[in-house]
A protein has these predicted regions:
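Cysteine-centered metal-binding/redox modules
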Residues: 1-167
Length: 167
Protein backbone atom coordinates (compact mmCIF):
# COMPACT_ATOMS: atom_id res chain seq x y z
CA UNK A 1 0.00 0.00 0.00
CA UNK A 2 1.10 3.56 -0.61
CA UNK A 3 1.61 5.92 2.31
CA UNK A 4 -1.54 7.80 1.29
CA UNK A 5 -3.56 4.56 1.33
CA UNK A 6 -2.16 3.72 4.75
CA UNK A 7 -3.03 7.19 6.08
CA UNK A 8 -6.59 6.79 4.78
CA UNK A 9 -6.84 3.33 6.39
CA UNK A 10 -6.18 4.67 9.90
CA UNK A 11 -8.31 7.21 11.75
CA UNK A 12 -6.72 10.34 13.24
CA UNK A 13 -7.31 8.70 16.63
CA UNK A 14 -5.10 5.73 15.51
CA UNK A 15 -7.97 3.23 15.28
CA UNK A 16 -7.61 0.96 12.26
CA UNK A 17 -10.36 1.72 9.74
CA UNK A 18 -8.74 -0.99 7.60
CA UNK A 19 -9.96 -3.77 9.92
CA UNK A 20 -13.53 -2.46 10.20
CA UNK A 21 -16.09 -4.33 8.10
CA UNK A 22 -17.61 -1.01 7.08
CA UNK A 23 -14.43 0.50 5.65
CA UNK A 24 -14.86 0.55 1.90
CA UNK A 25 -11.18 -0.21 1.16
CA UNK A 26 -10.63 -2.52 4.10
CA UNK A 27 -9.33 -6.03 4.36
CA UNK A 28 -12.63 -7.55 5.45
CA UNK A 29 -14.48 -6.22 2.41
CA UNK A 30 -11.72 -7.25 0.03
CA UNK A 31 -11.44 -10.78 1.42
CA UNK A 32 -15.21 -11.21 1.63
CA UNK A 33 -15.54 -10.26 -2.06
CA UNK A 34 -12.80 -12.71 -3.00
CA UNK A 35 -14.36 -15.58 -1.02
CA UNK A 36 -17.80 -14.75 -2.41
CA UNK A 37 -16.47 -15.02 -5.96
CA UNK A 38 -14.84 -18.38 -5.17
CA UNK A 39 -18.08 -19.77 -3.72
CA UNK A 40 -20.47 -18.14 -6.21
CA UNK A 41 -22.46 -20.85 -7.95
CA UNK A 42 -20.86 -23.56 -5.83
CA UNK A 43 -24.02 -24.31 -3.87
CA UNK A 44 -26.29 -24.35 -6.92
CA UNK A 45 -23.82 -26.42 -8.92
CA UNK A 46 -23.50 -29.11 -6.29
CA UNK A 47 -27.22 -29.25 -5.53
CA UNK A 48 -28.21 -29.45 -9.21
CA UNK A 49 -25.47 -31.79 -10.42
CA UNK A 50 -25.35 -34.15 -7.46
CA UNK A 51 -28.89 -33.81 -6.09
CA UNK A 52 -29.57 -37.56 -6.28
CA UNK A 53 -26.26 -38.52 -4.66
CA UNK A 54 -26.28 -36.13 -1.70
CA UNK A 55 -26.63 -37.41 1.84
CA UNK A 56 -28.46 -35.47 4.52
CA UNK A 57 -25.07 -34.39 5.93
CA UNK A 58 -23.94 -33.09 2.54
CA UNK A 59 -27.15 -31.11 2.14
CA UNK A 60 -26.71 -29.58 5.61
CA UNK A 61 -23.13 -28.56 4.77
CA UNK A 62 -24.22 -27.09 1.45
CA UNK A 63 -26.96 -25.12 3.19
CA UNK A 64 -24.42 -23.71 5.65
CA UNK A 65 -22.11 -22.79 2.75
CA UNK A 66 -25.01 -21.01 1.05
CA UNK A 67 -25.75 -19.02 4.23
CA UNK A 68 -22.04 -18.23 4.59
CA UNK A 69 -21.89 -16.93 1.02
CA UNK A 70 -24.92 -14.71 1.60
CA UNK A 71 -23.16 -13.29 4.66
CA UNK A 72 -20.02 -12.66 2.61
CA UNK A 73 -22.03 -10.75 0.05
CA UNK A 74 -23.48 -8.62 2.84
CA UNK A 75 -19.99 -7.80 4.09
CA UNK A 76 -18.69 -6.40 0.81
CA UNK A 77 -21.73 -4.98 -0.94
CA UNK A 78 -23.64 -1.81 -0.30
CA UNK A 79 -22.52 1.52 1.02
CA UNK A 80 -19.40 1.65 3.08
CA UNK A 81 -17.46 4.15 5.11
CA UNK A 82 -14.52 5.98 3.56
CA UNK A 83 -12.87 6.35 6.97
CA UNK A 84 -12.28 9.35 9.18
CA UNK A 85 -9.42 10.70 7.07
CA UNK A 86 -11.97 11.33 4.29
CA UNK A 87 -14.41 12.80 6.82
CA UNK A 88 -14.58 16.55 6.34
CA UNK A 89 -15.27 17.07 10.04
CA UNK A 90 -19.03 17.49 9.66
CA UNK A 91 -19.75 14.23 11.49
CA UNK A 92 -18.18 12.13 14.20
CA UNK A 93 -16.19 9.03 13.45
CA UNK A 94 -17.12 5.44 14.29
CA UNK A 95 -18.53 6.90 17.47
CA UNK A 96 -21.01 9.58 16.39
CA UNK A 97 -20.03 11.91 19.25
CA UNK A 98 -16.32 11.73 18.40
CA UNK A 99 -14.82 15.13 17.70
CA UNK A 100 -11.41 13.90 16.58
CA UNK A 101 -12.05 14.07 12.79
CA UNK A 102 -13.16 17.69 13.06
CA UNK A 103 -10.31 18.62 15.40
CA UNK A 104 -7.66 17.01 13.16
CA UNK A 105 -9.02 18.90 10.14
CA UNK A 106 -8.99 22.18 12.09
CA UNK A 107 -5.34 21.57 13.04
CA UNK A 108 -4.36 20.42 9.53
CA UNK A 109 -3.00 17.05 10.66
CA UNK A 110 -3.69 13.45 9.69
CA UNK A 111 -3.16 12.09 13.20
CA UNK A 112 -3.33 13.58 16.65
CA UNK A 113 0.34 12.51 16.94
CA UNK A 114 1.18 15.13 14.29
CA UNK A 115 -0.42 17.94 16.29
CA UNK A 116 1.75 20.28 18.39
CA UNK A 117 -0.89 20.08 21.15
CA UNK A 118 -0.82 16.26 21.46
CA UNK A 119 -1.60 14.90 23.98
CA UNK A 120 -4.22 17.57 24.55
CA UNK A 121 -6.89 17.89 27.20
CA UNK A 122 -9.76 18.50 24.76
CA UNK A 123 -12.97 16.65 25.42
CA UNK A 124 -13.39 15.56 21.79
CA UNK A 125 -11.93 12.10 22.54
CA UNK A 126 -14.65 9.63 23.56
CA UNK A 127 -13.90 8.02 26.92
CA UNK A 128 -13.99 4.46 25.60
CA UNK A 129 -11.11 5.08 23.16
CA UNK A 130 -8.91 7.39 25.25
CA UNK A 131 -6.30 4.74 26.03
CA UNK A 132 -6.18 3.55 22.40
CA UNK A 133 -5.98 7.17 21.23
CA UNK A 134 -3.12 7.96 23.59
CA UNK A 135 -1.08 4.77 23.07
CA UNK A 136 -1.66 4.56 19.31
CA UNK A 137 -0.75 8.17 18.63
CA UNK A 138 2.34 7.91 20.83
CA UNK A 139 3.43 4.91 18.73
CA UNK A 140 2.74 6.82 15.50
CA UNK A 141 4.69 9.81 16.80
CA UNK A 142 7.67 7.62 17.72
CA UNK A 143 7.71 5.06 14.88
CA UNK A 144 5.55 6.44 12.06
CA UNK A 145 2.24 5.49 10.50
CA UNK A 146 3.68 2.75 8.27
CA UNK A 147 4.94 0.77 11.28
CA UNK A 148 1.65 1.34 13.13
CA UNK A 149 -0.29 0.00 10.16
CA UNK A 150 1.99 -3.01 9.73
CA UNK A 151 1.69 -3.84 13.44
CA UNK A 152 -2.11 -3.58 13.49
CA UNK A 153 -3.42 -4.48 10.02
CA UNK A 154 -4.59 -7.94 11.12
CA UNK A 155 -5.99 -7.01 14.54
CA UNK A 156 -9.76 -6.68 14.87
CA UNK A 157 -11.25 -3.19 14.96
CA UNK A 158 -11.92 -2.10 18.58
CA UNK A 159 -10.43 -5.32 19.99
CA UNK A 160 -8.56 -3.40 22.70
CA UNK A 161 -11.79 -1.83 23.94
CA UNK A 162 -13.56 -5.20 23.83
CA UNK A 163 -10.78 -6.93 25.75
CA UNK A 164 -10.64 -4.17 28.37
CA UNK A 165 -14.41 -4.34 28.89
CA UNK A 166 -14.30 -8.12 29.33
CA UNK A 167 -11.34 -8.44 31.71
Amino acid sequence: MTKEEIINAVGPCSIMCYTCFGYINGGIRKHAACLYELYKGWYEGHVNVYKHDLTKEHIEKLNRINIFNEMLQGLYSGDGCEGCQKNNGERGGCIESCGIPKCSKEHGVNFCADCAEFPCKKDCVPERIKQQWHDGNNFIKEHGIEKWFEKNKTIAHYIDQYNAANE
